[in-house]
Amino acid sequence: MAIFEKTIRNQKFNTLLRKLEQEIPDSSWSADLEAGSDFKEGEARCSVRVFERYSVVGGNRLSLTLTMFQNGDSPIRLSAITAGGSQAVFFKVNTLGEEAFLDDVKDLLEEILEE
């Protein structure tokens, strides 16, 4: 499992979410948006997206859960967590696929934020 968290200022929540929904699947021939959920309560909102892609290194599929939260005009809190790319039964071996998926998302996010 690999985790990335970032606080994002001066971005529109919906615009950033839509760009990530489009760019993450476009970044890999096997990546797909599998599911999503949105919550809103007063000025607070939270969006969760689950992406999945094939890991050539691990020979399996792994997931990335993207969570974005914002309360009113406060900064956006983003969390990205990958899972499922390791091998073995009792301990984690070969998490390279998880780390690579997360690195790709970090790079995409930086490109989007530089626009």
Spans of model-derived segments:
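Positively charged, small/polar-rich N-terminal and surface patches that mediate targeting and assembly
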Residues: 28-29, 79, 84, 115
